[in-house]
Amino acid sequence: MMAIDKPLDFLWFIPSSGDGQYLGSDDLSRPADPGYFREIAKAADRLGYSGVLIPTGAACEESFILAADLAAHTERLKFLVAIRPGTASPAYYARLAATLDRVSNGRLLINIVVGGSAQELAGDGIFLPHDERYDHAGEFFQVFNSLVETGKANLDGKYIKAIDARLGLPPVQEPRPPLYFGGSSDAAIAFSGGITDKYLTWGEPPAQVAEKIAKVRKAAAAQGKHVTFGIRLHFIVRETDEEAWAAADRLISKLSDETIAAAQEVFAKSSDSVGQARMVALHQGRRDKLEVSPNLWAGIGLVRTGAGTALVGSPKTIAERLREYQALGIDTVIASGYPHLEEAYRVSELLFPEIGLPGPHGQIRSSFGERRVFGGGGHGGNVKIASAS
């Protein structure tokens, strides 16, 4: 166990394929809308989140272009943007990354997504077997890292060949923007230990997270590297535990058994991801055993690929669960909640004070020092409270 000596680094999420209030239902859904994404990013920027994750995939907006747009509408927010090796050359991605880091004044974080759906990868023109994708990614980032760190690269590899590759303009961050990565297979863990700066795990029970952290630390040490750790979780936080569990039930209240079965069939047929298999194993497609660890709820994974668990509870309860993960070595949380605009406020307003994170940035004072309470926003303003004598 590790001593907890500083607050968590907390990022939010841009739902770039769309959003909604119910899983598995079109009721009160929100389409992929750039204006809505800007609202979420601006809220996260003000509410105290350090950054946002922008996902990648066939159903999502292109992550680099969306990040460039959001950077123009925010001041301090960082952008965790995906690179999928094989969809373009490492030299091209190096130019994208350096330029985005420059135009955002050093606000780029890079998320390495090797891919877990053979069907989607085939659509991108990638046909490598599972483990070979990590060998390919290793060569890809040899070239990428050399370019963004030194401006030049050469490699005569099995998968990647680069002859006198050049990058004319460096990124703002030195030696380069940080590399994040998540994967649960042996090949993924070996790759992470040698390449990445921060290893990300999906929200599994603490004992399973501890096992993965130990494996990554061992792989990193064998290669003379140091890796830090983060966790990807959804959040359902309310003032009381009872309200939070009611909100979790509401989120899947329009989800039919037929929709669950169809989603699970797609996961089984299209994915060779070990991490996805671990997510499915937590709930086994059943909605009657979704609390897989204290306050860790697997309901989202019934129909959502990728991160499928949420911490559910009051601020105090969730803070206790987060401290358990921190004690294992987790220092970063990539969070989300449905719908993402409203839940960004709930997590910031309810949970952040409990875990020692500051409130909104740039908050304007609401009085000359007298205590006031919200009075409904009428013409008379908020209600003054006489100080005790």
Curated annotation (Swiss-Prot):
Keywords: Flavoprotein, FMN, Monooxygenase, Oxidoreductase, Plasmid. SUPFAM superfamilies: Bacterial luciferase-like. Pfam families: Bac_luciferase. Its EC number is 1.14.14.5. It is an enzyme of class 1 (oxidoreductase). InterPro entries: Alkanesulphonate_mOase_FMN-dep, Luciferase-like_dom, Luciferase-like_sf, SsuD_RutA_monooxygenase. One of its GO terms (biological process) is alkanesulfonate catabolic process. It catalyses: an alkanesulfonate + FMNH2 + O2 = an aldehyde + FMN + sulfite + H2O + 2 H(+). GO terms for molecular function: alkanesulfonate monooxygenase activity. It comes from the Bacteria. Belongs to the SsuD family. Catalyzes the desulfonation of aliphatic sulfonates. This is Alkanesulfonate monooxygenase. It comes from Rhizobium etli (strain CIAT 652). The gene is ssuD.
